[in-house]
Amino acid sequence: MYHIELKKEALLPRERLVDLGADRLSNQELLAILLRTGIKEKPVLEISTQILENISSLADFGQLSLQELQSIKGIGQVKSVEIKAMLELAKRIHKAEYDRKEQILSSEQLARKMMLELGDKKQEHLVAIYMDTQNRIIEQRTIFIGTVRRSVAEPREILHYACKNMATSLIIIHNHPSGSPNPSESDLSFTKKIKRSCDHLGIVCLDHIIVGKNKYYSFREEADIL
């Protein structure tokens, strides 16, 4: 359980932010500023505390649904929507920090970027990163989103955009909605298949990365097939 102490000096978080700076405020104080007001029976700091007590760690905050937020007394539709918008904006800011890096320097660097984008998806997404000779990203493209009837992409779909972008190399990334990045037999088979197809066209398949919840698996780092 996410443990919180409600401090007496946290009663005026806006004033504390002005006096001390945002980095000196607790998580519940920062959230209270975003919520702005409480209700007659419950001060805003008590509401923010209850929200954070509903999660095991701050990393799970983004997983709260609108319905879960609205189940907390004092959080209506407007406040829940504002919270979700704030979380999405924070996610995009974090993503933009990664996007500033022109070159893909390591599988770990790319995996951390893609965990932010795909780690909480409920469906399987397969993304291709197309690069030039300097490993600079030409295009990032979602090739498909898995459905009940289809959960495997065809190499020709991936290579079509590689040729269109005149890419010299590519990296494949997909997520496991289960949260575990451990590869399946079909993941292994697909990786071998896409490598053969890339080799045939003179395109380098640098890696196939599987992302889960805060974890990743790199075929380049872990297996001997790329």
UniProtKB/Swiss-Prot annotation:
GO terms for molecular function: metal ion binding; metallopeptidase activity. Belongs to the UPF0758 family. The keyword Disulfide bond does not apply. This is UPF0758 protein gbs1168. Zn(2+) binds at residues 174, 176, 187. It comes from Streptococcus agalactiae serotype III (strain NEM316). One of its GO terms (biological process) is proteolysis. The lineage of its organism: Bacteria, Bacillati, Bacillota, Bacilli, Lactobacillales. A motif (JAMM motif) lies at residues 174-187. Signal peptide: none annotated. Residues 103-225 form the MPN domain. It comes from the Bacteria. The keyword Disulfide bond does not apply.
